[in-house]
């Protein structure tokens, strides 16, 4: 299995039927709210280093996590803070992963033009005047791989760590068979 680095996991949970963002911002120190900038409320945690965004529809979005335990802990932490100030929260809150961003370094320089030609043209996009990498879509895994000439690969769009690892492993195998 490929040794990938998780850069960010984004997840959400429906923690309430509705949240009075203004009321929460008045009662909860440390929660940031500026209705002119953003309709939601933000709280940043230091351990783990994540941000939780709260929305009027009762959704909580967690971003910045490096692992699934950090997401679970962070959402529970915010739920507990909300309960302590009298906010009605659902008794059971499921967490759904929306996106995992992971990276891997092949450790060698890559010729993106050659790779683009060798891979399925329908699944690749290279416009180096607009973006310095090759965009390769793996629809079967829901993954998009950003491939850079430095050999760094960034995988986005997956909802499981195994899928990120599998997508990068498939790409590594394809690149290793190319005569470039």
Tell me the role of every PLM-derived stretch.
Residues 1-144, 150-152, 158-180:
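Intrinsically disordered, low-complexity polar/charged tails and linkers
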């Amino acid at each position: 299995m490929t040794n990938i680095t998780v850069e960010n996991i984004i997840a959400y949970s429906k923690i309430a039927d509705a949240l009075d963002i203004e009321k929460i911002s008045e009662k909860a120190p440390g929660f940031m709210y500026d209705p002119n900038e953003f309709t939601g409320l933000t709280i940043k945690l230091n351990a783990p280093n994540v941000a939780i965004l709260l929305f009027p529809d009762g959704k909580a979005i967690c971003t910045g996590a490096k692992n699934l335990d950090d997401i679970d802990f962070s959402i529970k932490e915010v739920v507990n803070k909300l309960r302590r100030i009298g906010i009605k929260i659902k008794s059971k809150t499921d967490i759904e992963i929306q996106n995992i961003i992971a990276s891997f370094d092949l450790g060698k320089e890559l010729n993106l033009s050659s790779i683009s030609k060798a891979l399925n043209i329908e699944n690749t996009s290279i416009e180096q005047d607009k973006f310095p990498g090759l965009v390769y879509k793996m629809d079967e895994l829901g993954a998009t791989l950003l491939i850079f000439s430095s050999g760094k690969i960034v995988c986005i769009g997956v909802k499981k760590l195994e899928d990120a690892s599998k997508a990068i492993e498939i790409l590594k195998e394809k690149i290793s068979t190319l005569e470039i």
